[in-house]
Amino acid sequence: MAKKWVYLFSEGNAQMRELLGGKGANLAEMTNLGLPVPQGFTITTEACTQYYEDGRTINDEIMGQIMEYIGKMEEITGKKFGDKENPLLVSVRSGARASMPGMMDTILNLGLNEEVVEVLSEKSGNPRWAWDCYRRFIQMYSDVVMEVGKKYFEELIDQMKAKKGVTQDVELTADDLKELAGQFKAEYKEKIGSDFPTDPKEQLMGAIKAVFRSWDNPRANVYRRDNDIPYSWGTAVNVQMMAFGNMGDDCGTGVAFTRDPATGEKGLFGEFLTNAQGEDVVAGVRTPMHISEMEEKFPEAFAQFKEVCKILESHYRDMQDMEFTVEHGKLYMLQT
């Protein structure tokens, strides 16, 4: 029997931290509790160790299992990876047993290319959203996978805002974002010497390798040395279906604690941004609103979120630190 390198969220649980990493084990646990988690799979910490043993390559057996599990995700979601008409878009995140600085940041909206964006923008009737997703993906992939500094892209965004006479990213139109995506790809080609990858499988493998590589980067190594974390642990990789907080004003994203982190007093503490994606809340691109204001904007999602918090606190018997997205008024839990 071949070794199992990949687990669906529905196949894991909170006890499997060593194999699935903290994030993966908790996503599995939330899935088992019946909470609204966008589905996906975790590539194990053992696959990371194997990647280094194989001279920093992903061997055929692991590669085969990853693609097999993409197939399972396609069945669950009814979407197809790399399909123009109904594309499966995913996020890729690292997840070690213990949370660590220096580990790879998230990549969102993976699976997009120019053709897919054109169809998405037409089908969704929301071209601004489609191009926003694409320019964010190019930006993150370039930064995280290829190590092209964020600043080059931020400068291009600032120039575009100046040209259009606006101050906020959200004020840029679909055409502005489309133009930015083109500028980003030109920047990528200039820095890397090849075209930005259009094949979703190539994008996915690039992102997974970047997570494995980040286990061995200088920041991670220093942190491990200082905190007695063995090198042999490796990191897991979580591949998850996207939930979109940036599709309009009935969408958003947030982070919250079930208690005040300073005093431990019970009550929701956190921040929320409408029409935004994950990193916007922490990146300080816009000023977020207090989590309590979410109740006015999204009463149903907020009521459900409060219920989820109750379930998680009583289940884990501990304060929870959560990330979530609201897509067209529907709540999705991304992490606890």
Where are these regions (language model features)?
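Nucleotide/phosphate-binding sheet-loop regions of phosphoryl- and nucleotidyl-transfer enzymes
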Residues: 1-336
